Curated annotation (Swiss-Prot):
Native species: Chlamydomonas reinhardtii
Sorted UniProt keywords: Cell projection, Cilium, Cytoplasm, Cytoskeleton, Disulfide bond, Dynein, Electron transport, Flagellum, Microtubule, Motor protein, Redox-active center, Transport
Domain of life (superkingdom): Eukaryota
Function text: May be involved in regulating the redox state of functionally important thiol groups within dynein.
Record-linked CDD domains: TRX_NDPK
Boundaries of every Thioredoxin domain copy: 2-109
Disulfide bonds: C34-C37
Cross-referenced PROSITE patterns: THIOREDOXIN_1 (PS00194), THIOREDOXIN_2 (PS51352)
Region described as Disordered: 107-129
Compartments where located: Cell projection, Cilium, Flagellum; Cytoplasm, Cytoskeleton, Flagellum axoneme
Assembly mode: Consists of at least 3 heavy chains (alpha, beta and gamma), 2 intermediate chains and 8 light chains.
Listed Low complexity bias regions: 117-129
Transmembrane helix found in the keyword field: no
This protein's name: Dynein 14 kDa light chain, flagellar outer arm
Length: 129
């Protein structure tokens, strides 16, 4: 089973990353001329298996494939983007395994239970005559 999904197009990016609530998506943005970073593969694999009870997915995508990632085209270092509920919540430039471990572990924690609904206001007391 592959633990990293490669994003092929904008539609997949939208469906897999931007429209998946409650899951931390870790996205490695790489350049087509050098491919995904092999140095970080073991870190991701360990996190994938150590945190398999958490809502967590790993992706890789070439910056040249998506117009929404054009700001990363030509970068020499891999970029790691962290998304939750369709919003980018963190970014790391370069291979920094301890920082990747910490951020993934912190951000992939299970979502807290929803807040209890507020109690209905008490009915006004009846006036005594």
């Amino acid at each position: 089973m592959a633990f990293i999904t490669e994003i092929a197009n904008e539609a997949q990016w939208k469906t897999e990353v931007l429209e998946t609530p409650g899951t931390l998506q870790v996205v490695e943005v790489f350049q087509s001329w050098c491919g995904p970073c092999k140095a970080v593969q073991s870190t991701f694999k360990k996190l994938y298996f150590d945190l398999n009870d958490r809502p967590l997915k790993f992706y890789s995508v070439s910056s040249e494939r998506l117009s929404s990632l054009k700001e990363y085209v030509g970068k020499c270092k891999p970029i790691f983007l962290f998304f939750k509920d369709g919003k980018q919540v963190e970014k790391i430039e370069g291979v920094k395994a301890p920082q990747l471990n910490r951020i993934v572990t912190e951000l992939s924690g299970k979502n807290p239970p929803p807040a209890a609904p507020a109690a209905a206001p008490a009915a006004p007391a009846a006036e005594a005559s």
